[in-house]
UniProtKB/Swiss-Prot annotation:
Quaternary structure (record): Homodimer.
Entry protein name: Protein GrpE
Disordered: region residues: 1-49
Stored CDD domains: GrpE (cd00446)
Annotated Basic and acidic residues bias: 1-25
Keywords, in A-Z order: Chaperone, Cytoplasm, Stress response
Protein's organism: Anoxybacillus flavithermus (strain DSM 21510 / WK1)
A GO biological-process term: protein folding
Function, in words: Participates actively in the response to hyperosmotic and heat shock by preventing the aggregation of stress-denatured proteins, in association with DnaK and GrpE. It is the nucleotide exchange factor for DnaK and may function as a thermosensor. Unfolded proteins bind initially to DnaJ; upon interaction with the DnaJ-bound protein, DnaK hydrolyzes its bound ATP, resulting in the formation of a stable complex. GrpE releases ADP from DnaK; ATP binding to DnaK triggers the release of the substrate protein, thus completing the reaction cycle.
GO MF terms, alphabetically ordered: adenyl-nucleotide exchange factor activity; protein homodimerization activity; protein-folding chaperone binding; unfolded protein binding
UniProt-listed Pfam families: GrpE
């Protein structure tokens, strides 16, 4: 009977010791797990912070890239416009290269036309006028080759782009706003008016 009780006490002590060791082991492991969890959370937070910083840097770089692209596009457009203006200026210079010469020749044409309208009876004077007319026609042909042409006026509707009204009349024989007389010829070089025609216009 005594032996049986002693055996039970021994088993009870063994159980208690085992339980105590288990509890000690748990109490020893718990702080380590907590430390590991804290470290993991800290690591995750650091990674999150680093990722946030990286995203911010990426956003800044993308903004700078967009700004650089926009500036490049503006510069490219400005250069294209500049190149187009230069080309147009060169084309205009080539197209209207004779403008200065033509402007200087117009008064000479006017003098030829006034001289050719003079009525003469003397044969020598007639021969002189014939020679002048030949020179005049040669000059007109040379100017035509450069694109110079006289502006039509009499009987045409008044056009302020090519006509300069210096007088107005009320003539029932003409439609209103019609050129009835030309005082001085106007000329165009290709599509550019070198000198408008001086005209009389019906009201």
């Amino acid at each position: 009977m005594f032996k049986g009780g002693e055996k039970m006490e021994k088993e009870q002590r063994t159980y208690d010791e085992t339980l105590e060791q288990h509890e000690d082991a748990q109490s020893e492991q718990a702080p380590e797990e907590q430390v590991e969890q804290v470290e993991n959370e800290a690591t995750q937070q650091e990674e999150k912070d680093e990722l946030t910083v990286a995203y911010e840097k990426i956003a800044q770089l993308e903004a700078k890239l967009a700004e650089t692209e926009n500036r490049f596009l503006r510069l490219h457009a400005d250069f294209d416009n500049y190149r187009r203006r230069v080309r147009l200026d060169m084309e205009a210079a080539e197209k209207y290269r004779a403008q200065s010469l033509v402007s200087d020749l117009l008064p000479i044409l006017d003098n030829f036309e006034r001289a050719l309208q003079v009525q003469v009876e003397d044969e020598k004077a007639k021969l002189l006028l014939q020679g002048m007319e030949m020179v005049y026609r040669s000059l007109i042909e040379a100017l035509k080759k450069e694109g110079v042409e006289a502006i039509e006026s009499v009987g045409k509707p008044f056009d302020p782009h090519v006509h300069q009204a210096v007088m107005q009349v009320d003539d029932q024989n003409y439609e209103p706003n019609t050129v009835v007389e030309e005082f001085q010829k106007g000329y165009k070089l290709k599509d550019r008016v070198i000198r408008p025609a001086m005209v009389k216009v019906n009201q």
